[in-house]
Structure formats: structure tokens, C-alpha cells
Regions:
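C-terminal nucleotide
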Residues: 1-13, 34-74, 82-85, 89, ...
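Short, amphipathic alpha-helical segments that act as regulatory/interfacial helices
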Residues: 29, 80, 118, 212-215
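Structural signature of FAD isoalloxazine-binding scaffolds in flavoprotein oxidoreductases
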Residues: 22-41, 161
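A short catalytic or substrate-binding loop motif that flags glycine-/basic-rich loops and adjacent residues
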Residues: 17-19, 27-29, 257
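Gly/Ser-rich oxyanion-binding loop with an adjacent helix/lid
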Residues: 1-22, 69, 73-184, 197, ...
Length: 313
């Protein structure tokens, strides 16, 4: 038996920046998904899990299945398909999988699950030689095309790389990444996972639409193609064309992409207080872009749980 692990992910700065070619800064949590796996000498992948169910996938049966939408078997099939499409030949394996990520924590379980399956195949059959970027790309394809939930690649990359990671999406086809060396345990703080009820999914998708609409009205494919000064100069016209909410969200894109870099720089310099200041600033701006009724619901939860303080003494 061989042990494998993929951490959950959270974003410190640069929310929604990926889709517009900006910067993202996040980290892989110590809580994630763990597996014990071994080759079984067959053409069957056998998954056994109390958290994700037990099922078998036949190697070579790579077509997406409608009935598997939003299931973990779809993710395994998707990862398997990516390896095979890349010309990689491998055998079946048995894996016992368990999750350490609390339900309702706001941290995706699909992302570390995808990366975990990729790590198992890479580790058992290819001497752990598959690069993190390739594993992340496989995860993105599995989630978008097999699981049925379109997504970016930020979280997959962070989970695959581990630790604190600054991502640069100026070239979306080949994102750049930099590992930031900082030990949070030595800061006197810890990152706490709390139940945030996951109440904002639909509202977050609207943010992406707003950002894309502003970029289109500026004649660009993404906001990163525009200079911030150009955006400010066109602000009055864009406000008329796109609406107030969209243009202020676009303004936050420029600020948030910059914050991601500043947060990473603060930790590189060992300035945790400056990192916290920027992180808090980022959180406050997000509240301004949540609809009133959702903001009230969020405020009620944070009052009960102190959710606004992710970092606690």
C-alpha cells in the first residue's frame, strides 16, 4: 500500500482574477483527502470510501456518462481519460479514500479528489513524474467535461503544488506560478475552517459575467488586456453601458489582482501584519458586491461564528 494526499485549497487574494488574466494567491490546507492505494493487476479501478462511495471504473471506458454527472465516479473517469488521451498506459488499482475536509467549510472537495486520483496514477505507474500543471489540467477537464461543472484551474494548481502559491494568468494557456515560503504556524495565527453554508454560488457566477461584459465593452477579451488607467478613463461611459455594479466589480478586479501580488510579497518579506491588513481589505470589498439580501444572510452567519476572522489567535 502507498499513501497519497491532496490538500484542500483557499484563495487569499485574486478571487475571480483567473478568468480575466490576473493574479491569484492561495494556499493548500493541511486538511484534505487521503488515500491508500496499490496496483491490483487488473483493468479495473476500484474505489472504496465512506465519504465518496464505493465504485468500479473499467480502464478504457472513457466516455462521459450523463447519469454520472456531479458524481465522484465521473471525476475518476475524467482523470483516467486525460491520462489515456495523453498516451499514458496504466493498470487498475485499489484505493481506500477518506476526506478530512469539514462539510460546509466552503472548501471544495472535488478539487483535491481530482488531484488525488491523478497523484495515485502518477505515483503507482509513472514514478510520480507527472508535473503539477498537468495534474491540474487533468482535474479541470474532469470537473468541467465529466462532472459537469465548468471551472478554472487556480484551485487545482494550488492543490497539486501544495503550500502557498502565487499564480499569474497573463497567459491562460500556460499559467506561471511561484511557491511562497512562509510558515503560518510560526505567526501565532492559524487558518480556521468554519461552516459558511455555501450560500453564494449563484451570485459568484454573476460576478464573472459582469467582468466579462465590461472587458467586452472595452474591446478586450479580458480585463488584464486593458490598462487600469484606460479603464478609469472610460469609467463614466462604461458605467452607462454596463451598469454600476459591473464597473465597480471591474475596478475591484484591478485592485484584487494587485492585492494577490502584495499579499505574496508581504509573506516573502516576513511581514504577516501587512499580509493580514491586505487580506482584511480584500474581504471587506467583497461584501460590497453581494446583493443586499445575501449580505444580510452573510452578516447573520458571521455574527454567530466570527466568519469574517478567518485567522484567529
Amino acid at each position: 500500500m502507498f499513501e497519497f494526499f491532496a490538500g484542500g485549497t483557499t484563495i487569499f487574494g485574486g478571487n475571480f482574477s483567473e478568468q480575466q488574466g490576473g493574479f491569484v494567491f492561495g494556499f493548500a490546507t493541511e486538511q484534505g483527502i487521503r488515500a491508500f492505494a496499490k496496483p491490483n493487476g487488473t483493468d479495473t479501478i476500484h474505489i472504496e470510501s465512506e465519504d465518496f462511495g464505493s465504485f468500479d471504473i473499467e480502464i478504457g471506458d472513457t466516455e462521459p456518462r450523463a447519469e454520472e454527472a456531479e458524481t465522484f465516479s465521473a471525476l475518476v473517469r475524467g482523470i483516467m481519460n486525460c491520462f489515456i488521451e495523453s498516451g499514458n498506459i496504466f493498470g487498475g488499482f485499489d484505493a481506500k479514500i477518506s476526506s478530512e475536509i469539514p462539510s460546509g467549510s466552503g472548501i471544495s472537495v472535488t478539487v483535491p479528489f481530482e488531484i488525488l486520483i491523478g497523484k495515485i496514477i502518477s505515483g503507482l505507474f509513472f514514478e510520480n513524474s507527472v508535473p503539477a500543471l498537468r495534474l491540474a489540467q487533468f482535474g479541470q477537464i474532469a470537473e468541467s467535461d465529466f462532472f459537469g461543472r465548468p471551472c478554472g484551474i487556480s484551485e487545482q494548481l494550488i492543490s497539486a503544488l501544495g503550500g502557498n502559491v502565487l499564480l499569474d494568468f497573463s497567459d491562460p494557456e500556460i499559467p506561471k506560478f511561484e511557491k511562497i515560503d512562509f510558515d503560518f504556524s510560526k505567526s501565532g495565527y492559524t487558518a480556521a475552517l468554519v461552516d459558511c453554508k455555501e450560500v453564494f454560488s449563484e451570485d459568484f457566477s454573476e460576478i464573472l459575467k459582469d467582468l466579462g461584459f465590461v472587458a467586452w465593452n472595452m474591446g478586450h477579451n479580458s480585463l488584464s488586456e486593458a490598462d487600469e488607467a484606460e479603464f478609469i478613463a472610460q469609467f463614466p461611459i462604461l458605467r452607462q453601458k454596463c451598469g454600476e455594479r459591473a464597473v465597480f466589480r471591474a475596478l475591484d478586479f484591478f485592485e484584487e489582482s494587485r492585492r494577490a501580488k502584495e499579499e505574496a510579497e508581504a509573506l516573502q518579506n516576513g511581514d504577516f501584519c501587512e499580509f493580514l491588513r491586505i487580506y482584511e481589505e480584500s474581504g471587506k470589498t467583497k461584501l460590497k458586491f453581494i446583493p443586499e439580501e445575501k449580505a444580510a444572510e452573510f452578516a447573520e452567519e458571521t455574527e454567530k461564528q466570527g466568519f469574517g476572522l478567518m485567522f484567529v489567535l
